[in-house]
């Protein structure tokens, strides 16, 4: 292409800016510092609209108060009867995600029945602002208190992965 030939480096004149990556060596935000995984295969059952622990719990100790924690959850859950199942997530005693908090965690719909298993996949970022051990857990309920909701039904596994991200 004649236009490209006209742009040959030999035709450039004057001082060109120099770019150095040396000043970027101190940037560490966004780096994964540690990964912790947890799982549960212990079945828990609910016929109540009161939230209860699902048995899925993970713990991570951030290295800095500026670190973020990426929380990834795959919660095994099933129900029978005309009800809905809700999942919510806690850091210690503080709700950080779930149906009540209005985060992007849903519920099973009324068409799932006869012990057909489904699951919730959840991903969200938390800012614990701590260098002490931080515990995350899921809770579940049976929203209409009819039928039965089960997590880890028949020893099906639920998983939690916690990634510390440099802040």
Residue ranges of predicted features:
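Glycine-rich, low-complexity segments
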Residues: 1-43, 167
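Residue-level signal for the start and early helices of compact helical domains
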Residues: 3, 7-10, 15, 27-29, ...
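Terminal beta-strand-rich extracellular "head" domains
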Residues: 39, 43-45, 50, 61-133, ...
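Extended, low-complexity regulatory regions
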Residues: 56-58
């Amino acid at each position: 292409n004649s236009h490209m030939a006209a742009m040959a480096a030999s035709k450039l004149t004057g001082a060109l800016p120099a770019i150095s990556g040396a000043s970027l060596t101190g940037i560490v935000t966004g780096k994964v510092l540690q990964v912790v995984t947890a799982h549960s295969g212990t079945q828990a059952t609910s016929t109540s609209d009161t939230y209860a622990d699902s048995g899925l719990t993970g713990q991570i100790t951030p290295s800095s108060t500026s670190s973020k924690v990426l929380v990834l959850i795959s919660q095994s859950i099933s129900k029978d009867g005309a009800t809905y199942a809700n999942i919510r997530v806690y850091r210690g005693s503080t709700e950080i995600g779930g149906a009540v908090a209005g985060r992007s965690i849903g519920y099973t719909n009324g068409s799932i029945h006869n012990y057909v298993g489904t699951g919730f996949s959840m991903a969200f970022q938390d800012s614990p602002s701590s260098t002490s051990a931080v515990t995350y857990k899921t809770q579940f309920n049976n929203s209409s208190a009819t039928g039965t909701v089960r997590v880890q039904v028949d020893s099906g596994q639920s998983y939690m992965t916690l990634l510390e991200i440099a802040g």
